[in-house]
Amino acid sequence: MSITAERKAALIKEYATVEGDTGSPEVQVAILTERINNLTDHFKDHKKDNHSRRGLLTMVSSRRSLLDYLKKKDEGRYSKLIGSLGIRR
């Protein structure tokens, strides 16, 4: 259900702007997207898990805020990120 440390490190390495960058919006959105995808798979088997569904909605909202910030600051980075992650917008 959660992402492994190896997968998280791979996401950080792939989306980091500089070496060791874990706080950029791209990295945060990539990690949130991975967690959201894992939870949506979880809900296919556990339809009544409303406690986790609330966490999913919180993650989606947080990702949306980060994407809005990135779009406001640099639209080129924003469009590149949603293209590589496969997020529709």
Swiss-Prot record:
InterPro entries: Ribosomal_uS15, Ribosomal_uS15_bac-type, uS15_NS1_RNA-bd_sf. PROSITE patterns: RIBOSOMAL_S15. It holds the Pfam family Ribosomal_S15. Disulfide bonds: none annotated. The keyword Acyltransferase does not apply. Keywords: Ribonucleoprotein, Ribosomal protein, RNA-binding, rRNA-binding. The keyword Ribonucleoprotein applies. GO terms for biological process: translation. GO terms for molecular function: rRNA binding; structural constituent of ribosome. GO terms for cellular component: cytosolic small ribosomal subunit. Belongs to the universal ribosomal protein uS15 family. One of the primary rRNA binding proteins, it binds directly to 16S rRNA where it helps nucleate assembly of the platform of the 30S subunit by binding and bridging several RNA helices of the 16S rRNA. HAMAP family: Ribosomal_uS15_B. Part of the 30S ribosomal subunit. Forms a bridge to the 50S subunit in the 70S ribosome, contacting the 23S rRNA. This is Small ribosomal subunit protein uS15. It comes from Rhizobium rhizogenes (strain K84 / ATCC BAA-868) (Agrobacterium radiobacter).
